Amino acid sequence: NIEVLELAKKHDMVYAAIGFHPTDLDSFDFTFLEEHINDDKVVALGEIGLDYHYDNDIDTKKRQIDPFKKQIELALKYNKPVIIHSRDSIMDTYNVVSSYSNLRGSLHCYSGSLEMAKLFVEKGFLLGVGGVVTFKNAKIVKDVVKNIDLKYLLLETDSPYLAPEPHRGEVNTSTYIPIIAEMVASIKEIDISDVATT
């Protein structure tokens, strides 16, 4: 959080999202967030959310949900969007998110089902689409891209992870966004210029 704030202050075109990732809750500092949420360069709270990939016992779930809710409430208080991390936790994520009205933001690196995607879109959320959409076996993500209106899809990286084909296994960078855009255009059977301008 401190590094991203310093980077944003040094560069005019760089803005910051601050927050505590669900796997970094040992360092959770709500006071820090309150002190910096209104900094000129802070535009969102994130990545925040739930991650049950490595540990899905009841204690882990309980430990992650409260900080997630506190960060959402802070975002609402200061009218900031949220960037949500949801890994192997899509139903709990939706249950938390749907308990708040006027919450806006995106689901980073969306990997849930089409049915869940529709529920999040109904709440006004954007769905992050990254390099995974280019993977041969990414049928669920491709189904989401095909069936969700383009205006709800947000092209992104998960740098340095999940580089698109043919760069899979390499360090991911924002220079690969055009590859993701081409795949989205192909799946939706539209021109890439439509993807670029939506």
Which residues does each PLM region occupy?
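Mid-domain alpha/beta scaffold segments of enzyme catalytic cores
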Residues: N1-T198
